Amino acid sequence: MMKKLLLLLFIVCTSFVYAQENWGDLKKNKLTLKEIPPVWPGCSGSAVEKEHCFNQELSKHIMSNFTYPTQEYNNNIQGRVVVSFKINTKGFVEIKNVRGGNKGLQEAAKTIVLKIPKLTPGMMGGKPREISMSVPFNFKTNKK
């Protein structure tokens, strides 16, 4: 009986301690939604593991698909090309901008990016979201 009385007393006392009449202005509170980046096919695990896997797979993709345009190589045309693109809400790549280098180098870089496989799209608030990215390409012939 004494235990029940002490428990009841404890519950009553703690309810007074935590009771609040004024919750404050809810408009001042902000909810921050975390952006979840796209996921490369076959990548799994924690967010950090998926991001690491994505970066590794993208690097492998670039290395295995990289070709130096023949005309540019033969003429010792070199340069840095940056391809800006987005992964749309369906997981496909859409080129936004290609800058640097000449037309041939730009087309080669663009082709590599367009060969990226369908990804699991990025998410925010549980909904698919377009995610923008940029990838630099350095074209060097190592000729003198």
Regions found by a protein language model. Give the residues of each.
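Charge-biased low-complexity segments
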Residues: L6-L7, V17-K144
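Repetitive helical segments and hydrophobic/amphipathic motifs
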Residues: V12-C13
